[in-house]
Every structure is written in structure tokens, then in C-alpha cells.
Amino acid sequence: KKANLQFYKDNKIKNIGLTSPHSVTIPGAVHAWCSMHEKFGRIDFKEVLNGAENFARKGFPVHEVEAIAWKENEKKLKKNPNSKRLFLNQNLSYSYGEVFKNIPLANTLRVISKNKIKGFYQSEITKDMVKTLNKLGGLHTEEDFYNQKTLFSKTITNSYRNLKIHQCPLNSPGLVVLMMMAMTEKLNIKKYHPSSFERYHLQAEISKICFEVKETIFGDPNFNNINIKDYLSNEYISSLCSRINKNKIYSSKKSSVTSHPETIYLSCLLYTSDAADDKQC
């Protein structure tokens, strides 16, 4: 609430770095889990988080790829006492195959499993997060956490090989996925072997072009009026396909696509075979 434009002007802040407290938004995932479970869930909420809590409490062997990334960020982790305490072992990153435990996370998940939304947004956990962020210079307040809400949106759809594909609306990358699928169908990508050079090349080019559109045109629907049908039209998809050269790599002339170091993956499981209960998961 306090992070308005005037604050950044007064403090001459022109860029917000990835490690800046000003880049930290109010976490929405926990609220979304609880809201979806309340609306659609059939199993006990404690069971939903039980697996994650067990992995955090009992530990798991570090994957080779994660060990490499961990090592690359070792210096960054040493700069903050909390990250140093939680993610370093005797001041070193965890190695491939080494068991990593995160007891504080396990304890937090247990509180959430018992108290749900209040356990994360109106609790000692909230106070601790706000205190930590404020100490780093953040403007976050407990009220910001209390006011967090989950929005339920209608899906956006498009056809693909006689199937109806549903995706989340903007500003998620759902529209990008639908555009990619439309391009693969337009280019008849299935005629190429899955492991062929042609298939890999087309998939890479399609991804680059669609994400370029996302980065240069799409935005928050509250501030950017986008007509989804325009970007899924036959004419527009054809124009995107025309940018692809089967013998050359596509290079953006507008701007480079910025890297995003984090992402979220969410999976919902269906626990019933009764078609009438398909809405319950």
C-alpha cells in the first residue's frame, strides 16, 4: 500500500533489483491453495501439505542440477544471515546427493495446514515476515498481508486438434501457451519426427516469438486492454509463423526477453472417477 509512485520518485529509485526488498510482493500462493481447497477440495487440507512438510522435515538428497545452481549462488546466500543459516552447510552450499532439511519451512507448513489462511496471513509468521522486510528497507505492513485475496477467473480457450484447451487469463502466460499451440498446428509440426532438427528448431522459434509478444505487448489486464481473440486469430498466428525461417535463427529486433529466475508450478489431482463429481478435486 505504501509502495506508491511518489515514494520511488522521492527516493530517486529508478530500478528495483532482484534482491531488493521492494521487489518482494505479498505472497499469494498460500491464499490460493486454501481458497481452492475450500471451493473444490475433498481430502483434508492437512493431507494436501503433508508430503511437502515431510520432505522439508526429514530431508531429501540434492539433485545434481540443483547442486550446481546452489554453488553458483553461494556468495549471494552468504550476504543474508537467514539465507546463510537455512541454505548453507558450514558456510558451503549443499552438494549433489547431500541430504538437505528445512525444519523452519516444515514448521510453517504445519501451521498453515492447521490454521490455513490465518496461519500465514494473520499470525506470528506474518509479523516475522514484515519485521524482516522492514529491517531490509521494505514498506510492507501486516495490513498488506491481511488484505491479500485470491481471484477466481474464467479460463481463456482455443481449439487444438479438435480439443478445447483451457488456460489462465492474463497476466499469466496462458495466452502465450495458446498462441504456441496455434502456431504448431499452423506449421503442421507433427509431420516432423519428435527428435528431429526441424522439430527442435520450430519449437524454439515458436517459443521465442510468442514470448517476445508477451514481453512487448501483454501486461496487467487492469491497465492494459488486450483483446485475446485478436492474438489467436488466423491472421495474427499466420503473421507470427511468417517470421520463422527454417534455415535461420530468429532474432528479435524490438527487445530482448528478460530472464525470470523463478516460477510456480501448480497441479490439481482428481480423486474421483464419478463424472458428476468432476468439479471436485
Predicted segments with their positions:
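Noncatalytic scaffold domains of N-terminal-nucleophile
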Residues: 1-122, 126-172, 232, 236-246
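Short alpha-helical scaffolding segments that buttress acidic/His motifs in well-ordered protein cores
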Residues: 52, 109, 180, 206-210
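Extreme N-terminus nucleophile/cap motif
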Residues: 123, 180, 263
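Short glycine-rich loop/turn motifs
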Residues: 153-155, 177, 261-266
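M16/insulysin-pitrilysin zinc metalloprotease superfamily fold
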Residues: 174-190
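Internal maturation/activation junctions in enzymes
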Residues: 189-270
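Conserved small/polar residues in nucleotide/adenosyl-binding loops
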Residues: 271-278
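Cationic, low-complexity basic patches in intrinsically disordered or flexible, solvent-exposed regions
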Residues: 281
